[in-house]
Amino acid sequence: MADRCLLYYITDRSQFPGDERTRRRVLLATVAEAARARVDYIQLREKDLSARELEMLARDALTAVRNSTPLRTENRELRTRLLINSRTDVALAAGADGVHLRAEDVAPHDVRHVLEVSTHRPLTTDHFLVAASCHTVADVFRAESEKADFAVFAPVFGKRGGAGTPPAGLAALQEACRAKIRVLALGGVTIDNAASCLEAGAAGVAGIRLFQENKIEDVVRALRAL
């Protein structure tokens, strides 16, 4: 079991009520709440936005994170870190802490190579995180070989309503966690079943509704007590 449960909030403003302006305001407030509660990572996953719109939202989200971090520090390892879904270009333009790559995106080691060439220095987790979405055990080991910093394995328990990819289950999660990179569990994870993910070897848990439909401070307190 992980020494400290890593927590990964994935955003989805479409779940919030109201018009677009209201949803963005609520999203940024939720991002700030997550930073205050010391969630480790936030993934800005607003896939419908254009690159320019996403960059603007990412800058606002970064401001919300930095203004809400209890330690008031610029040390990225000591505050909530913001990753952008899929768009490495937007992550770099906005000054985000990393990118979360989908299975169909450029491989993690290629992202690292481009960044190392452009910055003339080795890419470390202090500078930029590269996370990878994984849906099979093989995906996780591929992410490890391609130098991802961590993998998000999903869906473990399935999505609400039962639609989409069938749940992989805890046995598959346990097998995936044999990889040397950190693996976070996603998909139907709740406060009640998160402990079973950690017992399977996960370094932490990720979710959308887990954070957006609950008071984040309470979620963090419960999960960090596991």
Named regions from a protein language model:
Residues 205:
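C-terminal binding/interaction regions
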